[in-house]
A protein has these predicted regions:
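Charged, low-complexity helical/coil segments in non-catalytic cytosolic or luminal regions
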Residues: 27-32, 57, 81-271
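Alpha-helical transmembrane signal-anchor/signal-peptide segments
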Residues: 27-53
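Hydrophobic secretory-pathway targeting helix
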Residues: 1-36, 257, 266-267
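Short, charged/polar low-complexity linear motifs in solvent-exposed/disordered segments
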Residues: 40, 78-79
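Functionally constrained cores in energy, signaling, and assembly domains
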Residues: 22-25, 30, 45, 65, ...
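A short linear-motif detector with a strong N-terminal bias
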Residues: 6, 38-40, 66-70
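Short extracytoplasmic
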Residues: 44-77
């Protein structure tokens, strides 16, 4: 037992040291480097004009976003007018740890449990293609675009053709779910499934501001940026504030949490 306890303590110390060093590196190396790159970035006011002299440089690009290829989910066979989406799945399960009040339960629910949707399981995001002005967006740039909305603009005809139905549920934060159509004609039962999609919130014709590295006519990802694609035309200061480095407060919290892990590990080793 003592050996397992010490082994657990050693593991906590190793994990704590790793995260502590990573947090310090972010605060004292990565953040200053990223801020310096943003301050030195070339501000491109019109994305229709690409200057070859900016190749290899960090650029702040303002222009009109265009979705050139929608994101496609192979699992359900659906297209989305978004450059990046992620599907999440919920399964109906019987649970005895329900928040439902006992007096509201049926005898079967008291005996076997209450049917509830379990926690969501998210798959890897899938992406389409897009451009800003004459800049094509590279795959690594697209992979860094934030998913900030739950998709609700479903094409009902396309859903029906694929065998799914839009079933909103306001009792959940995500609200906008789809289910296999054959589930919607009966009461729910265990192992029923439903899905929702998280998506990047950008539409063709929107004015956007992007941070990236110019590579010919392609905009590539810039390491260390928290938000590489933003709505509206932003000036340099607004870009640095909104899309710059992660907050120092969060990184300090991470460093302190790492120290607590290390301390906990040492206590397990010596006690």
């Amino acid at each position: 037992m003592k050996i397992l306890k010490k082994a657990g303590g050693i593991l906590l110390v190793i994990i704590g040291i790793f995260f502590f060093v990573s947090a310090l590196k972010m605060i004292f190396v990565d953040n200053p480097k990223t801020k310096a790159a943003l301050k030195d970035a070339v501000y491109v006011d019109a994305a229709d004009t690409i200057d070859p002299e900016n190749d290899g440089k960090t650029v702040i690009v303002c222009g009109t976003f265009e979705l050139t290829e929608p994101a496609h989910d192979d699992e359900l066979g659906l297209d989305f007018d978004s450059i990046r989406i992620s599907i999440s799945k919920q399964t109906m399960k019987l649970t005895k740890s329900s928040s439902k009040k006992k007096e509201a339960m049926t005898d079967d629910e008291k005996k076997y449990g209450v049917l509830e949707w379990n926690s969501s399981f998210s798959s890897m995001p899938v992406s389409g293609q897009g451009k800003i002005g004459n800049y094509a967006l590279s795959q690594d740039f697209i992979d860094d675009i934030m998913l900030t909305k739950t998709w609700e603009d479903y094409d009902k005809a396309a859903l029906s053709s694929a065998g799914y139905t839009y079933v909103p549920d306001n009792t959940y934060t995500q609200k906008h779910f789809i289910e296999p159509s054959n589930q919607t004609t009966r009461s729910h039962k265990e192992y029923d499934v439903r899905y929702y999609y998280s998506a990047a919130d950008f539409e063709t014709g929107q004015t956007v501001t992007a941070i990236g590295i110019q590579d010919g006519q392609t905009l590539k990802s810039t390491p260390g940026i928290t938000e590489n694609l933003m709505k509206n035309k932003l000036d340099r200061d607004e870009v640095i504030k909104q899309g710059g480095t992660p907050g120092v407060g969060a990184q300090i919290f991470s460093a302190v949490s790492s120290l607590l892990l290390i301390l906990g590990g040492f206590l397990l080793i010596i006690l």
